[in-house]
Amino acid sequence: MPIPCPHFKITIVKRSQGQSAVAGAAYQSGERLFSEYDQKTKFYNKKKELVHAEIMLPSHAPPGYADRATLWNAVEAVENQWNSQLARRIVLAFPVEIPKEQYLSMIKEFCQEQFVSKGMIADFAIHDKGGGNPHAHILLTLRAMDEHGRWLPKVRKVYDLDENGERIRLTGTCRPALL
């Protein structure tokens, strides 16, 4: 019997390394997006494994941020330093033992509980070529939004601690599907 091979990687999108939140969003969603920062269109037309892409907003976020280009261009505009950290990128693998029909509800629940409920915006995409590597990409704003839809200052490690300061465990979301 094969053993599940978990993969969960968190990185920061950094302008100082030539990275772009708009490019990351274009890559994971398969959409053609124009970057106002460098005046270039970002498009990765070789991405054939896209299953689903969605943006999850907190209730008080401006509705215009449901548009991927608007959201990530706004993020890049507010992060205006040459060495700005633009977004948090998470890539996580789905265990192949979990039925594909559960991927969407699992990732939405995870994003809602861990990020959107804390005021962050989550842009996620599920990829699956059908070759045993189903995974999700999540692009997160580093700043949460206040109740008026304005960006708050960045908060360190908001993604890995719950309201009691305890470490968040992914098993809470995935465990029922694995049993």
PLM feature spans:
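N-terminal nicking endonuclease/strand-transfer module with a His-rich metal-binding environment
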Residues: 1-179
